[in-house]
C-alpha cells in the first residue's frame, strides 16, 4: 500500500505527507528536546564546537570490513570521528578517535555503559537519553529527526538523521569548521540481506563490519 501510493503520487506530495506526519509525531517530543536540562546543557556544549577546527581536515571512520585492509596507524595524529561500535578497535589501534557519534537506539541501548566510558567527546541522539542515568561532562545529545533540513548549519537545533550516523558525523564535521572531510571504511556493501528498519537478533558472527563481534550472536 505504502509503496503503491509512492509510485502514483508526485514527489512533492509524498515529501509533504511524510514531513507532516513526522511533524505531528514529533510534537510531544518538542518541549523536552529544547527545555530538558540535559538538552539545554547539550546545546551549550555543542555550540562550543562551532568552527573549532576551521580550515583543518578530519577523517570519518566507518565500520566496514575494509578497515581490515587499511593502515589506520596513519590516523594517530589526525582529527577523526568514530561511530557506533568503532571502540572495539581502539585497543588494537592504541589510540581513540577524536570524537564519537551514535544515533541508533538499539546500539545505544545495548552499549550505553561502554559508550559512556569512552574518554572522548560523544554526540548521541536525544531519543536515546533514557538509557543513561546521568549526563557525563563529555556527552552531548543531538535533537535528530527523520525529516528536516537536509544538512544542518546549526547543530544545536533539529537535525536530519539521514538514515545513517555517517550523515550526522558529516554535519558535525562541517559545523566544527573542518574544510576537508575524508571518509574511510564506509563500504556500502552488506553480506546479510533483510528488510529496512526491521529488528533482528544476530545468530552468529557479523560479516558486515570490521569485527565478527561487532553485531555478534545475540545482538539486536
What annotation goes with each model-predicted range?
Residues 2-220:
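Metal-ion/cofactor- or nucleotide/acyl-coenzyme-handling active-site neighborhoods
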Amino acid at each position: 500500500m505504502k509503496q503503491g501510493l509512492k509510485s502514483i503520487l508526485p514527489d512533492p506530495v509524498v515529501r509533504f505527507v511524510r514531513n507532516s506526519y513526522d511533524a505531528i509525531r514529533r510534537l510531544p517530543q518538542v518541549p523536552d528536546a529544547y527545555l530538558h536540562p540535559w538538552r539545554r546543557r547539550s546545546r551549550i556544549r555543542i555550540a562550543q564546537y562551532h568552527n573549532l577546527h576551521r580550515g583543518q581536515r578530519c577523517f570519518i571512520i566507518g565500520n566496514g570490513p575494509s578497515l581490515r585492509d587499511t593502515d589506520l596507524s596513519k590516523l594517530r595524529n589526525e582529527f577523526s570521528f568514530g561511530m557506533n561500535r568503532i571502540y572495539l578497535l581502539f585497543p588494537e589501534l592504541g589510540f581513540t578517535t577524536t570524537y564519537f557519534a551514535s544515533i541508533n537506539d538499539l546500539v545505544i541501548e545495548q552499549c550505553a555503559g561502554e559508550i559512556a566510558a569512552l574518554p572522548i567527546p560523544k554526540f548521541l541522539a536525544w531519543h536515546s537519553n533514557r538509557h543513561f542515568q546521568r549526563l557525563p561532562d563529555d556527552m552531548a545529545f543531538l535533537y535528530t529527526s527523520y525529516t528536516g533540513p537536509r544538512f544542518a548549519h546549526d547543530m544545536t537545533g533539529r537535525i536530519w538523521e539521514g538514515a545513517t550516523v555517517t550523515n550526522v558525523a558529516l554535519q558535525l564535521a562541517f559545523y566544527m569548521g573542518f574544510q576537508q572531510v575524508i571518509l574511510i571504511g564506509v563500504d556500502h556493501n552488506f553480506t546479510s540481506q533483510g528488510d529496512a528498519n526491521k529488528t533482528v537478533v544476530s545468530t552468529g558472527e557479523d560479516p558486515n563490519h570490521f569485527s565478527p563481534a561487532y553485531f555478534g550472536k545475540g545482538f539486536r
